[in-house]
């Protein structure tokens, strides 16, 4: 509450001017429209304003997570958890895309629905259909998220860490890698059926300054060796943390 109280109208205005700035904007339109129609709407809606380059400070981000564990009590019926792996910042352009594809491949191998870990967790009742994984990344940040509902989130995390260590020791099976690679490429192609998804993807690629064709090719060109290297450098215990939301105790 103290931090909210310290926000002034002047600070909000500064944030608004910095964030909602044409120099910081990308417009992507997908659908049955022409460029002339889009530009006509832009000329009508967008007001002339002074633009300035957005300056972002360079932050020396530590490799390790700040806290290993965070726990809160909120009005939920079942405990919810999220395990995160903090990424090393600095990847841009195609390097960031390839890093994302490598991580997606590893997440499927580690805890996708066809993985041994997923089967064990589900059979033992430690996870349900809410279990999901995601890799989020952008300019200067990246994080892998694994979570869902579980009555024993710490046990899930322990089994996940064991699975990571086991895969690191044994290496990635070439046949499994090829199968997952084809699956992810097919998923990437299937998303082109959604106009909304295409627009969102093109916005992401515009900020990364990556061509769509190069993005699609990354799913086929990423190799097994670089995925194993990614496993060794990204899925490390010191960069991991867990956040748990417990139900509020009933009086």
Spell out what each predicted region is.
Residues 1-54, 92, 98, 114, ...:
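Charge-rich, well-structured scaffold segments of protease-associated domains
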Residues 53-116:
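His/Glu-based metal-binding/catalytic segments typifying zinc-dependent metallopeptidases
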């Amino acid at each position: 509450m103290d931090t909210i109280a310290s926000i002034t109208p002047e600070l909000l205005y500064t944030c608004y001017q910095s964030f909602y700035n044409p120099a910081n904007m990308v417009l992507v339109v997908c659908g049955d429209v022409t460029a002339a129609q889009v530009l006509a709407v832009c000329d009508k809606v967008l007001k002339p304003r002074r633009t300035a380059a957005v300056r972002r400070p360079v932050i020396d981000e530590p490799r390790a997570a700040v806290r290993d564990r965070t726990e809160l009590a909120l009005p939920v019926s079942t405990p919810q958890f999220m395990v995160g792996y903090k990424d090393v910042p600095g990847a841009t352009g195609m390097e960031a895309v390839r890093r994302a594809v490598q991580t997606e491949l590893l997440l499927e191998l580690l805890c996708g629905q066809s993985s041994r870990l997923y089967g064990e967790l589900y059979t033992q009742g430690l996870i349900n259909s809410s279990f999901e994984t995601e890799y989020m990344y952008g300019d200067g940040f990246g994080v892998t998220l694994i979570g869902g509902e579980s009555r024993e989130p710490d046990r899930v995390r322990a089994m996940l860490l064991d699975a990571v260590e086991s895969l690191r020791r044994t290496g990635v099976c070439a046949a499994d890698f090829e199968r997952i690679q084809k699956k992810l490429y097919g998923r990437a192609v299937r998303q082109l059926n959604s106009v909304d998804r295409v627009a969102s993807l093109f916005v992401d690629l515009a900020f990364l300054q990556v061509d769509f064709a190069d993005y699609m090719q990354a799913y086929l060109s990423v190799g097994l060796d670089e995925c194993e290297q990614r496993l060794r450098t990204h899925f490390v215990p010191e960069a991991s943390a867990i956040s748990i939301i417990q139900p509020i105790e009933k009086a």
